[in-house]
Regions:
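Long, charged, glycine-rich C-terminal linkers/tails
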Residues: 102-115
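Electropositive, glycine-dotted interaction segments
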Residues: 1-96, 102-105
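GG-anchored amphipathic helix commonly corresponding to the ABC/SMC/Rad50 NBD signature/C-loop
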Residues: 114, 119-125, 129-162, 171-176, ...
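ABC ATPase nucleotide-binding domain "signature" loop
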Residues: 164-170, 199
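C-terminal lobe/lid and adjacent interdomain/linker elements of RecA-like ASCE P-loop ATPase modules
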Residues: 176-259
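Proline-centered flexible-loop/turn and helix-kink motifs
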Residues: 99-102, 165, 186
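Short beta-strand micro-motifs in enzyme catalytic cores
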Residues: 44, 113-115, 209
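Short, well-ordered strand-loop elements centered on a beta-strand within folded domains, enriched
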Residues: 1-10, 115-121, 217-226
Length: 259
């Protein structure tokens, strides 16, 4: 499609499309395009807010996680009953990202739900319990990102987007966070936005997994990294994080899409 008109198609007959409407909606009536439409329509995008996660909430079914993570206590309660393995995976990564954390669970309080963390305390024989109000932004943000990555909606694992997952996290936790993202991507498509060189400081990241984003003249251009960046990757000259620090990420001019 270009300008709302079909240039080339695998189908003999197509519904009418216009330049000011998303063509995929019209095409979703065709069996061949329906899975694409369902997958994109089911995409979830999250930006967990520690402030929202601290507030006690009325209990909900916990399906799905809200964009700001405000109902995360209900989601954890759902996972405890319906998917204990997912709950364990979330806690394992949380322990690796936030040393000293033992577990997290939903806690009822006068008809409301909140989070309760079990954490090691120096000199104590066992872990202490802390409410969400006493836990750092970084811990809450890490929990929100992990639940967004692994929880899913019902039986589905739709594509998931997370905005700047590194916010409020210690730079040393970036490697574990990347491991969690890789793990989640084995089961669902994961899309991230990031400004963090620390998160991208890994030789396992390939140029085909990255999109460069630039603001040019009031428009946003998005595309795969340009030839200079790809050469640096191919020759193992720099990691993605090092290139980002040097402000060398540019979208390929021929394929950049403006918004």
């Amino acid at each position: 499609l270009r300008g709302g008109r079909a240039v080339r198609s695998s189908e003999n007959r197509l519904p009418r499309t216009t330049a000011d409407r998303l063509a995929l909606v019209a095409l979703s009536g065709l069996e061949e395009f329906r899975p694409v439409y369902d997958g994109l329509a089911g995409m979830e995008v999250f930006n967990p807010s520690p402030e929202a996660m601290r507030r006690p909430q009325a209990p909900t079914p916990g399906d799905p996680l809200r964009r700001d993570g405000s109902n995360i206590a209900s989601v954890l309660e759902r996972l405890r009953h319906s998917s204990p393995e997912t709950e364990r995976r979330v806690e394992e990564y949380l322990r690796a990202i936030v040393p000293g954390t033992r577990s997290v669970r939903s806690s009822a309080m006068s008809g409301w739900e909140t989070l309760e963390f079990q954490q090691d305390v120096s000199g104590s024989a066992g872990p202490w319990s802390f409410p969400a109000s006493a836990v750092s932004d970084g811990t809450l943000r890490a929990l929100g990102v992990l639940v967004a990555l692994f929880a899913g909606t019902g039986e589905a694992l739709s594509p998931v987007g997370v905005e700047e997952p590194e916010i409020a996290l210690h730079p040393a936790a970036a490697g574990v966070l990347l491991d969690a993202i890789r793990d989640a991507s084995e089961h669902r498509q994961v899309l991230l936005t990031t400004h963090s060189p620390d998160l991208l400081d890994s030789s396992t990241i390939l140029p085909g997994e990255l999109f460069a984003v630039r603001s040019v003249g009031g428009t946003t251009e998005v595309g795969h990294p340009d030839a200079a960046v790809r050469f640096a990757f191919d020759e193992s000259l720099f990691t993605a994080g090092e290139l980002l620090r040097a402000d060398q990420f540019q979208p390929e001019p021929e394929e950049a899409v403006s918004r």
